[in-house]
Amino acid sequence: MRFLHLSDLHLGKRVCEFSMLDDQRYILEQILSLLDSHPVDAVLLAGDLYDKPVPPAEAVRLLDWFLTELSRRELPVFAISGNHDSADRVAFGSALLAESRVYVSPVFSGPPEPITLTDAHGPVDLYLLPFLKPVMVRHVWPDAPIESYNDALSCVLDHCSPDPARRSVLVAHQFVAGAASCESEEPSVGGIDWVDAALFDKFDYVALGHLHSPQKVGRNTLRYCGTPLKYSFSEASQHKSVTFVELDEKGSVTIAAEPLVPRHDLRELRGSYMELTDRRNYEGTAVDDYLHITLTDEQDIPEALARLRVIYPNLMRLDYDNRRTQTRQELDAPAKAEQKTPLEHFADFYQLQNNQPLTHEQAAFCQQLIESIWKEEDA
């Protein structure tokens, strides 16, 4: 059985106040073309369908169009809500959508029930697990000892028992320990929201969402597919793709990536104003790309942003890197420290002293300790 694994569409996202909707439609059209030339049996959407819990109407229409196009191709779709989504809004109409074989995770109320597809090798059970927070799981099992994200996921999966003789796929949206993150994702403070990769061992393939870099975590079948587009300049060097997964007989899983080509790339340029405005340097290049330009001039260039946008119309961000800005960064460091939480300060100190980050258990313990100290002071 062959799947397309997608996640983190972030429909409606704005990067540096530039709307990405046209680029998102372009890349979704490209994905549909890939599906036409690389047939699959189902599509997995591993959360963060939207960029905000209350998405703009244009983003809702875009997702509606994409799901309709998948349904027109008679492809079952298995989708979950992510941390950027409203689980209630994503689940709206899910019973009706299921009649068209668009299966959407419900608002979390207990362990997921399998949805079964069948091929020549037998049944494949698919489990849809929306983004989880500890409070959601404590609401279902109030007597369970749940203090962390890891405890929460462990509790849920302890109540989920896929048949070991059958192939099983889990679609989930969590931060798995050992994975690499980037700045466009919501920050993880001291690893407090990490979950252990070993919790997923009972599944043949785990289609993960949440992190924007395509990667495996430990075993090859525990995988983030990454975003289809670059959503921050920390992703500028990444090569975006979609992930095709083929489950043959039990224990046989083949994974392949197909590259995606964006309408506009997201890149970084660096140089002096004279270098970047020299026709010989920019002619024949993709000047319409989304750009972060760093000027190395020692003096500010008057109206540099407006003047550079004559050549580079999609210039998103402009910075300077010179002796003056380097000195300013040193002076700004104490101010940035004032904006950090006590846990973030301790996590930085721990990293400096031990050359490794806090574990999620340590971070959870520290947070409890900090809260108890603050309560004592308030009392």
Question: How would you label these PLM feature ranges?
Answer:
Residues 8, 28, 43, 48, ...:
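Divalent metal-coordination and catalytic microenvironments
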Residues 199-239:
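Acidic, glycine-rich loop-and-beta core segments that form the ion-binding/anion-interacting portion
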